[in-house]
Design a protein with these regions (language model features):
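Helix N-cap motif at beta-to-alpha junctions
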Residues: 107-112
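Short beta-strand-centered aromatic/proline hotspots
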Residues: 166-172
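A common structural junction motif
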Residues: 120-128
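Short amphipathic alpha-helix segments
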Residues: 66-86
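Short glycine-/aliphatic-rich beta-strand segments at the starts of folded cytosolic domains
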Residues: 49-64
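Short, low-order "capping/linker" segments at domain edges
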Residues: 139-154
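Conserved small/polar residues in nucleotide/adenosyl-binding loops
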Residues: 204-210
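Short coil-to-beta transition motif at edge beta-strands of beta-rich domains
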Residues: 152-163
Length: 210
């Protein structure tokens, strides 16, 4: 195999092949022309053009989250990307703090939804999804997704005052939390609507922002 460069875009490739078939020696020579063309992959083009399909808005309810808490929430996205099958659209277009929270703009709606599910399972809270139509292609609507995630103002193990008594969230459920009464070890389920008026009175592992 010999490569002979003709110019910056064309190369002649000379190939010699030999083989023995039924004790007979065969030899062949071939020449082909290879042409190089510059191109950019679709994903690279989209990333360079600030393409995005979804925005995840990290917010809080009841109290203002600290920078550390927002950083911890943001780091969970890296874990989600690692655990999901490789997809060239799983990229971050831009991100940064905004008034009242932190926004992450993503190249994939599927990634945004997976992250939202992960946030709820690990940190509780609620996700509100809205979809907007931004155009049409091949007869189908092109849409963008906005996920608003609100983290509760307390974590598992914290003590909250709810319905005049002290409770401790022990686990998150799909629509709320399982809470345990501090005095009697009584357990019950509560939806986020039920917990709207709950106030945290003791934090286990938290330094509140000043």
């Amino acid at each position: 195999l010999v490569a002979q460069e003709v110019d910056g875009r064309h190369t002649l490739i000379h190939i010699e092949m030999e083989g023995i078939i039924d004790n007979l020696l065969y030899a062949e020579r071939h020449t082909m022309r290879a042409r190089m063309s510059n191109g950019v992959c679709l994903t690279c083009t989209r990333r360079a053009g600030n393409y995005f399909e979804a925005t995840v808005q990290l917010r809080s309810s009841a109290r203002r989250l600290s920078e550390k808490e927002f950083s911890e929430l943001r780091l969970t996205l890296d874990k989600v990307i690692i655990e999901m099958p490789d997809d060239p659209m799983f990229f971050i277009t831009k991100e940064g703090p905004v008034t009242g929270g932190y926004d992450v703009v993503l190249g994939s709606k599927a990634l945004a939804r997976a992250w939202g599910r992960h946030l709820i399972s690990k940190h509780g809270g609620q996700v509100t999804a809205t979809t907007s139509v931004v155009g049409r292609k091949d007869g189908a609507d092109l849409t963008r997704l906005t996920l608003l995630y609100r983290k509760p103002g307390y974590a598992l193990g914290d003590v909250i005052r709810w319905r005049g008594e002290l409770w401790r969230p022990s686990s998150w459920s799909g629509e709320g939390a399982i809470v345990e009464k501090v005095e009697k070890r009584e357990r019950t389920g509560a939806t986020w609507r039920d917990l709207e008026n709950a106030n945290a009175v003791s934090y286990t592992h938290l330094t509140l922002p000043t």
